[in-house]
């Protein structure tokens, strides 16, 4: 166990230096390296994984702040991020404060693409849930369904719910207090299946 902790700590320090990301403890950082013979090429992907019962705050190379909830996974290409665009892959739940930049910030989930420039929102894209939800607090967000290719512009105080089965997106009134309660260590449920309530409690604690 001690050896594993030392290895994780070493990878953490190296990853921060190379990717310019600031990451709090209790998360797993993995960098993928492509080998050519005995020589390793520069680091390609940064992967941030938050385990069950934990949370994490990270700052991406463009100064975007991300507050990750338990059982979340975020990754991006170190060499390509913030060149022509700022693209990440994501699953789980997180609160994003996107740094203002003329390069679009794109979040790719398994069922939806989220494109923004500078804004704040909560994104819930857990693989086991029947929907993907985004609650917008500030700015504007363009959403595109991977299934139907439907694009919708989301405005402040609106919430988008994408049905994974049909791929359709519907817009409802935002519930920022409810959707971001987890950031304060609180769980708020409204009209949620009891199984999901138990899953969230298990995930959080």
Which positions does each model-derived feature cover?
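A residue-level detector for the "anchor" residue at the start of short, highly conserved motifs
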Residues: 3-205
């Amino acid at each position: 166990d001690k050896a594993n902790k030392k290895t994780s700590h070493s990878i953490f320090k190296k990853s921060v230096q190379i990717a310019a990301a600031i990451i709090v403890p209790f998360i797993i950082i993995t960098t993928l390296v492509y080998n050519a013979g005995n020589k390793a090429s520069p680091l390609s992907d940064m992967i941030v994984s938050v385990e069950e019962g934990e949370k994490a705050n990270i700052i991406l190379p463009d100064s975007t702040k991300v507050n990750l909830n338990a059982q979340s996974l975020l990754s991006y290409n170190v060499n390509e991020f913030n060149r022509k665009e700022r693209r990440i892959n994501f699953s789980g739940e997180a609160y994003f404060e996107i740094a203002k930049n003329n390069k679009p910030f794109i979040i790719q989930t398994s069922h939806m693409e989220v494109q923004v420039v500078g804004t704040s929102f909560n994104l819930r894209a857990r693989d086991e849930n029947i929907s993907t939800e985004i609650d917008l607090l500030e700015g504007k967000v363009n959403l595109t369904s991977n299934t139907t290719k439907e694009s919708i512009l989301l405005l402040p105080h609106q919430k988008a719910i994408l049905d994974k089965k049909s791929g359709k997106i519907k817009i409802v009134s935002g519930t920022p207090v409810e959707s971001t309660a987890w950031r304060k260590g609180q769980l708020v449920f409204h009209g949620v299946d009891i199984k999901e309530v138990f899953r969230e409690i298990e995930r959080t604690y």
